[in-house]
Design a protein with these regions (language model features):
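Domain-scale signature associated with acetyltransferase and cell-envelope carbohydrate enzymes
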Residues: 1-303
């Protein structure tokens, strides 16, 4: 576990000379080997913790960029070692950022209040008017979702399952979000109440609100240009690209959604591929594929 210390007066003066400001310099803590060399035009407020900035990132085309903080505003943020945070239009608030994160040209990233990050959101699957809602969570399986949606003649079972899910969601709720190690977020818009796992790559997303991106090193998640997601959970190894719009959806592992696909109140399980069309209140089973334009699926189970 890292140990932190307060800034020295010399370090505070160096930061001021680089056009950095703070509401209270005493609220900023740094690791022992911290240096101010790569921090410019940055504003700090609340409790801020900073790691070291020693390594470089190699970008596409051979461009090299040194880790550091450039033209950013941080509020109640912990920054890991060797991160590059640059050109944040508004601010980053209430986040713990892992090592080697690369965040550039982003509008805003924040957690506002206590969030469950998509856990516990009820998805009105199979009946768009409600009655068979499935509360989604990080560990949702097709089997569990099937029972929750179709075994409504077993009300005690459904009630107990929902209690377990609610308990899990509450245990994972926090007023601080996490951005994992080796995460890339570039050219993105509005990111609010989103938990982002290791090695996730977000490029040009329009809006991500109230959700979890359960990425990891072995199966990273990619979120592409123009994507808009509200009240969602996306599992490891999935790709959501090209203007896809999701509202109250669960995306299981290794799914691919793209080409302006639109879905609401739907569940997509392992290895689904959805492109071009629309979905409302569907239960998409394993290995389901649709890539035709004007395909509209409503209120059904599709395998």
């Amino acid at each position: 576990m890292k140990t932190y210390r307060s800034l020295t007066q010399e370090e505070i003066q160096q930061l001021k000379e680089r056009s950095c400001t703070a509401v209270d310099w005493d609220e900023i803590e740094v690791v022992e080997n911290f240096k101010t060399d790569y921090i410019y035009h940055t504003r700090f407020s609340g409790k801020v913790r900073l790691g070291v900035f020693e390594d470089e990132f190699t970008l596409a085309g051979g461009m090299r960029k040194h880790s550091g903080l450039y033209h950013a505003t941080l509020h109640n943020v912990t920054v890991g070692d060797n991160c590059c945070i640059e050109n944040i239009k508004n601010y980053i608030a209430n986040y713990i950022i892992g090592d080697y994160a690369f965040i550039e040209n982003v509008d805003i990233i924040l957690v506002d209040g206590r969030s469950k990050f998509g856990n516990g959101v009820e998805v009105a699957v199979l009946n768009e008017t409600g009655g068979r809602e499935v509360p989604i969570h990080d560990r949702l399986s097709a089997h569990q979702a099937y029972i929750l949606a179709l075994y409504r003649h077993r009300p005690e079972l459904i009630c107990r399952m929902k209690v377990i899910i609610d308990q899990y969601a509450e245990e994972n709720a926090s007023d601080t979000g996490t951005i994992g190690h080796h995460v890339t977020i570039v050219d993105a818009g509005y990111i609010k109440n989103v938990r982002i796992g290791d090695y996730c790559k977000i490029e040009g997303a329009g809006r991500l609100k109230n959700g979890s991106l359960n990425s990891n090193e072995q199966a990273p998640i990619h979120i592409g240009y123009g994507v808009v997601c509200d009240d969602f959970i996306i599992s490891s190894g999935s790709n959501v690209e090209d203007g896809t719009m999701l509202t109250r959806c669960f995306i299981s592992q290794a799914c691919h959604l793209g080409h302006n696909y639109s879905a609401s109140d739907s569940l997509f399980f392992i290895n689904c591929q959805e492109e071009n069309g629309e979905a409302c209140a569907i239960f998409a089973g394993l290995l389901r594929v649709t890539d035709h334009k004007y395909t509209l699926l409503i209120a059904g189970i599709f395998y």
